[in-house]
Amino acid sequence: MALGDANVGSAPGVDFSALQRVKQSEELLAQLYVVEETPRRLGRGPVHALMVISVLSVVAFIATLLMRYNTFVTMSEDTQAKRSNYEVMIQRRDNLFGNLVKLTLNHAALEHSIFSHTSDKRTEGVEAGKGGPIGSALEQLMKQGGIGKLLGDIGGGKALLGADGGFGNALGRLMAVVEQYPTIQSVDTYKHMMTSLVEMEDRIATRREDYNAAASTYNIEITKWPWNYLAFITGFKRAEYFQEKPAGDTPIITPQLFQELLPLNHAQDIKK
Protein backbone atom coordinates (compact mmCIF):
# COMPACT_ATOMS: atom_id res chain seq x y z
CA MET A 1 0.00 0.00 0.00
CA ALA A 2 2.75 2.36 0.82
CA LEU A 3 4.39 1.51 -2.36
CA GLY A 4 1.16 2.03 -4.27
CA ASP A 5 0.58 5.35 -2.63
CA ALA A 6 4.04 6.39 -3.42
CA ASN A 7 3.50 5.42 -7.01
CA VAL A 8 0.32 7.43 -7.19
CA GLY A 9 1.85 10.44 -5.62
CA SER A 10 4.85 10.15 -7.73
CA ALA A 11 2.87 9.40 -10.89
CA PRO A 12 2.98 12.00 -13.47
CA GLY A 13 -0.07 14.28 -13.05
CA VAL A 14 -1.33 17.62 -14.08
CA ASP A 15 0.92 20.60 -13.57
CA PHE A 16 -1.20 23.00 -11.65
CA SER A 17 1.18 25.86 -12.06
CA ALA A 18 1.04 25.51 -15.81
CA LEU A 19 -2.70 25.46 -15.71
CA GLN A 20 -2.74 28.62 -13.66
CA ARG A 21 -0.43 30.28 -16.10
CA VAL A 22 -2.65 29.29 -19.01
CA LYS A 23 -5.68 30.58 -17.18
CA GLN A 24 -3.99 33.88 -16.45
CA SER A 25 -2.97 34.16 -20.08
CA GLU A 26 -6.56 33.63 -21.18
CA GLU A 27 -7.76 36.26 -18.76
CA LEU A 28 -5.16 38.69 -20.07
CA LEU A 29 -6.15 37.96 -23.64
CA ALA A 30 -9.81 38.42 -22.74
CA GLN A 31 -9.05 41.76 -21.15
CA LEU A 32 -7.08 42.84 -24.18
CA TYR A 33 -9.89 42.06 -26.60
CA VAL A 34 -12.73 43.46 -24.55
CA VAL A 35 -14.68 46.05 -26.67
CA GLU A 36 -15.63 48.98 -24.58
CA GLU A 37 -19.07 50.24 -25.64
CA THR A 38 -19.25 53.81 -24.47
CA PRO A 39 -22.25 55.99 -25.57
CA ARG A 40 -21.36 58.64 -28.09
CA ARG A 41 -22.72 62.11 -27.60
CA LEU A 42 -23.48 64.32 -30.55
CA GLY A 43 -21.93 67.68 -30.57
CA ARG A 44 -24.09 70.66 -29.57
CA GLY A 45 -23.28 72.52 -32.79
CA PRO A 46 -25.24 70.37 -35.30
CA VAL A 47 -28.24 70.08 -32.99
CA HIS A 48 -28.35 73.82 -32.46
CA ALA A 49 -28.13 74.45 -36.20
CA LEU A 50 -31.01 72.07 -36.90
CA MET A 51 -33.17 73.76 -34.28
CA VAL A 52 -32.43 77.21 -35.71
CA ILE A 53 -33.23 76.06 -39.24
CA SER A 54 -36.51 74.51 -38.09
CA VAL A 55 -37.59 77.63 -36.22
CA LEU A 56 -36.69 79.89 -39.14
CA SER A 57 -38.61 77.65 -41.54
CA VAL A 58 -41.73 77.79 -39.38
CA VAL A 59 -41.46 81.56 -39.00
CA ALA A 60 -40.96 82.03 -42.75
CA PHE A 61 -43.95 79.80 -43.51
CA ILE A 62 -46.22 81.70 -41.10
CA ALA A 63 -45.00 85.05 -42.43
CA THR A 64 -45.72 83.94 -46.00
CA LEU A 65 -49.23 82.87 -45.04
CA LEU A 66 -49.89 86.19 -43.32
CA MET A 67 -48.57 88.19 -46.26
CA ARG A 68 -50.70 86.21 -48.70
CA TYR A 69 -53.74 86.63 -46.47
CA ASN A 70 -53.18 90.39 -46.38
CA THR A 71 -52.89 90.37 -50.16
CA PHE A 72 -56.24 88.60 -50.40
CA VAL A 73 -57.80 91.19 -48.08
CA THR A 74 -56.41 94.10 -50.11
CA MET A 75 -57.62 92.68 -53.40
CA SER A 76 -61.02 91.85 -51.97
CA GLU A 77 -61.50 95.37 -50.62
CA ASP A 78 -60.36 96.89 -53.91
CA THR A 79 -62.84 94.73 -55.78
CA GLN A 80 -65.67 95.70 -53.44
CA ALA A 81 -64.79 99.39 -53.75
CA LYS A 82 -64.88 99.26 -57.54
CA ARG A 83 -68.15 97.36 -57.43
CA SER A 84 -69.57 100.09 -55.20
CA ASN A 85 -68.35 102.77 -57.63
CA TYR A 86 -70.11 100.96 -60.45
CA GLU A 87 -73.37 100.72 -58.50
CA VAL A 88 -73.12 104.43 -57.60
CA MET A 89 -72.86 105.30 -61.29
CA ILE A 90 -75.88 103.11 -62.04
CA GLN A 91 -77.88 104.90 -59.35
CA ARG A 92 -76.71 108.26 -60.63
CA ARG A 93 -77.73 107.32 -64.15
CA ASP A 94 -81.18 106.32 -62.95
CA ASN A 95 -81.61 109.56 -61.00
CA LEU A 96 -80.27 111.90 -63.66
CA PHE A 97 -82.13 110.28 -66.49
CA GLY A 98 -85.52 111.17 -65.06
CA ASN A 99 -84.34 114.64 -64.05
CA LEU A 100 -82.90 115.35 -67.48
CA VAL A 101 -86.09 114.29 -69.19
CA LYS A 102 -88.19 116.45 -66.88
CA LEU A 103 -85.82 119.39 -67.33
CA THR A 104 -86.07 119.07 -71.09
CA LEU A 105 -89.84 118.88 -70.90
CA ASN A 106 -89.96 121.99 -68.74
CA HIS A 107 -87.67 123.97 -71.02
CA ALA A 108 -89.52 122.92 -74.15
CA ALA A 109 -92.91 123.68 -72.60
CA LEU A 110 -91.69 127.02 -71.24
CA GLU A 111 -90.22 128.05 -74.57
CA HIS A 112 -93.32 126.96 -76.42
CA SER A 113 -95.54 128.82 -73.96
CA ILE A 114 -93.47 131.99 -74.19
CA PHE A 115 -93.32 132.16 -77.97
CA SER A 116 -96.93 131.05 -78.37
CA HIS A 117 -98.09 133.70 -75.91
CA THR A 118 -95.90 136.31 -77.58
CA SER A 119 -97.21 135.42 -81.02
CA ASP A 120 -100.81 135.65 -79.86
CA LYS A 121 -100.28 138.98 -78.17
CA ARG A 122 -98.35 140.30 -81.14
CA THR A 123 -101.22 139.37 -83.44
CA GLU A 124 -103.73 140.99 -81.12
CA GLY A 125 -101.59 144.09 -80.80
CA VAL A 126 -101.08 144.44 -84.52
CA GLU A 127 -104.78 144.00 -85.24
CA ALA A 128 -105.85 146.36 -82.46
CA GLY A 129 -103.26 149.06 -83.07
CA LYS A 130 -102.46 149.14 -86.72
CA GLY A 131 -100.97 152.51 -87.45
CA GLY A 132 -100.61 153.25 -83.71
CA PRO A 133 -97.44 153.37 -81.60
CA ILE A 134 -97.65 149.72 -80.49
CA GLY A 135 -98.24 148.30 -83.96
CA SER A 136 -95.57 150.44 -85.60
CA ALA A 137 -92.92 149.70 -82.99
CA LEU A 138 -93.75 146.01 -82.96
CA GLU A 139 -93.65 145.64 -86.73
CA GLN A 140 -90.37 147.57 -86.91
CA LEU A 141 -88.73 145.37 -84.26
CA MET A 142 -90.00 142.20 -85.93
CA LYS A 143 -88.48 143.31 -89.24
CA GLN A 144 -85.13 143.90 -87.53
CA GLY A 145 -84.76 140.43 -86.11
CA GLY A 146 -88.00 138.81 -85.06
CA ILE A 147 -89.03 137.96 -81.55
CA GLY A 148 -85.44 137.51 -80.34
CA LYS A 149 -84.60 141.07 -81.35
CA LEU A 150 -87.79 142.26 -79.69
CA LEU A 151 -86.84 140.66 -76.39
CA GLY A 152 -83.22 141.80 -76.61
CA ASP A 153 -83.93 145.45 -77.45
CA ILE A 154 -84.38 147.07 -74.06
CA GLY A 155 -85.34 150.43 -75.52
CA GLY A 156 -88.09 148.99 -77.68
CA GLY A 157 -89.35 146.92 -74.76
CA LYS A 158 -89.58 149.96 -72.50
CA ALA A 159 -91.45 151.87 -75.20
CA LEU A 160 -93.98 149.11 -75.44
CA LEU A 161 -94.28 148.92 -71.64
CA GLY A 162 -95.22 152.58 -71.59
CA ALA A 163 -98.20 152.03 -73.88
CA ASP A 164 -101.70 151.27 -72.76
CA GLY A 165 -103.33 147.85 -72.86
CA GLY A 166 -102.68 144.33 -71.62
CA PHE A 167 -99.99 143.59 -74.17
CA GLY A 168 -97.52 145.85 -72.39
CA ASN A 169 -98.04 144.06 -69.07
CA ALA A 170 -97.73 140.65 -70.71
CA LEU A 171 -94.55 141.69 -72.48
CA GLY A 172 -93.13 142.95 -69.20
CA ARG A 173 -93.74 139.60 -67.60
CA LEU A 174 -92.25 137.92 -70.64
CA MET A 175 -89.08 140.01 -70.44
CA ALA A 176 -88.74 139.15 -66.76
CA VAL A 177 -88.90 135.47 -67.61
CA VAL A 178 -86.41 135.84 -70.44
CA GLU A 179 -84.01 137.79 -68.23
CA GLN A 180 -84.20 134.93 -65.74
CA TYR A 181 -83.68 132.32 -68.50
CA PRO A 182 -81.52 134.11 -71.09
CA THR A 183 -80.93 131.02 -73.25
CA ILE A 184 -84.20 129.17 -73.50
CA GLN A 185 -83.62 127.04 -76.56
CA SER A 186 -85.06 123.59 -76.67
CA VAL A 187 -82.58 122.37 -79.27
CA ASP A 188 -79.62 123.06 -77.00
CA THR A 189 -81.46 121.41 -74.13
CA TYR A 190 -81.91 118.25 -76.17
CA LYS A 191 -78.23 118.27 -77.10
CA HIS A 192 -77.18 118.69 -73.49
CA MET A 193 -79.50 115.90 -72.42
CA MET A 194 -78.14 113.46 -74.97
CA THR A 195 -74.55 114.48 -74.19
CA SER A 196 -75.16 113.87 -70.50
CA LEU A 197 -76.67 110.48 -71.20
CA VAL A 198 -73.71 109.47 -73.36
CA GLU A 199 -71.25 110.64 -70.70
CA MET A 200 -73.07 108.65 -68.04
CA GLU A 201 -73.03 105.51 -70.17
CA ASP A 202 -69.31 105.97 -70.85
CA ARG A 203 -68.61 106.34 -67.13
CA ILE A 204 -70.66 103.25 -66.36
CA ALA A 205 -68.75 101.26 -68.98
CA THR A 206 -65.44 102.46 -67.51
CA ARG A 207 -66.49 101.53 -63.98
CA ARG A 208 -67.62 98.11 -65.18
CA GLU A 209 -64.29 97.48 -66.91
CA ASP A 210 -62.37 98.57 -63.79
CA TYR A 211 -64.39 96.22 -61.61
CA ASN A 212 -64.02 93.26 -63.96
CA ALA A 213 -60.25 93.82 -64.12
CA ALA A 214 -59.97 93.93 -60.33
CA ALA A 215 -62.22 90.88 -59.99
CA SER A 216 -60.10 88.96 -62.50
CA THR A 217 -56.87 89.69 -60.60
CA TYR A 218 -58.50 88.73 -57.30
CA ASN A 219 -59.96 85.49 -58.67
CA ILE A 220 -56.62 84.45 -60.14
CA GLU A 221 -54.85 84.97 -56.82
CA ILE A 222 -57.31 82.96 -54.75
CA THR A 223 -57.52 80.06 -57.21
CA LYS A 224 -53.80 79.47 -57.83
CA TRP A 225 -52.26 76.45 -56.12
CA PRO A 226 -51.44 76.20 -53.22
CA TRP A 227 -53.05 79.47 -52.17
CA ASN A 228 -56.49 78.17 -53.08
CA TYR A 229 -56.36 76.09 -49.87
CA LEU A 230 -55.60 79.19 -47.84
CA ALA A 231 -58.42 81.07 -49.55
CA PHE A 232 -60.81 78.20 -48.86
CA ILE A 233 -59.83 77.99 -45.19
CA THR A 234 -60.03 81.76 -44.65
CA GLY A 235 -63.36 82.10 -46.49
CA PHE A 236 -62.37 84.08 -49.59
CA LYS A 237 -64.72 83.41 -52.49
CA ARG A 238 -64.66 84.27 -56.17
CA ALA A 239 -66.02 87.62 -57.27
CA GLU A 240 -68.74 87.61 -59.89
CA TYR A 241 -68.13 89.49 -63.13
CA PHE A 242 -70.52 92.15 -64.35
CA GLN A 243 -72.14 91.28 -67.63
CA GLU A 244 -73.79 93.64 -70.07
CA LYS A 245 -77.33 94.33 -68.90
CA PRO A 246 -80.22 93.43 -71.17
CA ALA A 247 -81.68 96.29 -73.15
CA GLY A 248 -84.85 96.19 -71.07
CA ASP A 249 -82.91 97.07 -67.90
CA THR A 250 -81.38 100.22 -69.39
CA PRO A 251 -83.35 103.49 -69.45
CA ILE A 252 -84.36 104.34 -73.00
CA ILE A 253 -86.35 107.09 -74.66
CA THR A 254 -89.46 105.47 -76.05
CA PRO A 255 -91.36 106.98 -79.00
CA GLN A 256 -94.09 108.13 -76.61
CA LEU A 257 -91.55 109.79 -74.35
CA PHE A 258 -89.83 111.37 -77.35
CA GLN A 259 -93.14 112.90 -78.43
CA GLU A 260 -93.54 114.28 -74.92
CA LEU A 261 -90.10 115.85 -75.17
CA LEU A 262 -91.03 117.72 -78.33
CA PRO A 263 -92.70 121.12 -78.13
CA LEU A 264 -96.45 120.97 -78.43
CA ASN A 265 -96.65 122.24 -81.99
CA HIS A 266 -94.03 119.73 -83.18
CA ALA A 267 -95.76 116.89 -81.38
CA GLN A 268 -99.03 117.80 -83.03
CA ASP A 269 -97.34 117.84 -86.43
CA ILE A 270 -95.91 114.38 -85.83
CA LYS A 271 -99.28 113.00 -84.79
CA LYS A 272 -100.81 114.43 -87.94
UniProtKB/Swiss-Prot annotation:
It holds the Pfam family LemA. It is a single-pass membrane protein. Residues 68-272 are lumenal. InterPro entries: LemA-like_dom_sf, MamQ_LemA. The chain crosses the membrane at residues 47-67. It is found in: Magnetosome membrane. Its main location: membrane. GO terms for cellular component: magnetosome membrane. Induction: Part of the probable 18 gene mamAB operon. It comes from the Bacteria. Disruption phenotype: When both copies of this protein (amb0972 and amb1005) are deleted cells have no magnetic response and no magnetosome membranes. Deletion of just amb0972 leads to an intermediate magnetic response and still makes magnetosome membranes. A careful electron cryotomography exam shows that in the double deletion empty vesicles that might be magnetosome precursors are present. Deletion of genes mamH to mamV (amb0961 to amb0978) gives cells with no magnetosomes and no magnetic response. PANTHER family: PROTEIN LEMA. Essential for magnetosome formation. Can be used to induce magnetosome formation. Belongs to the LemA family. This bacteria makes up to 20 cubo-octahedral magnetosomes of about 45 nm in diameter which contain membrane-bound crystals of magnetite (Fe(3)O(4)). This is Magnetosome protein MamQ 1. It comes from Paramagnetospirillum magneticum (strain ATCC 700264 / AMB-1).
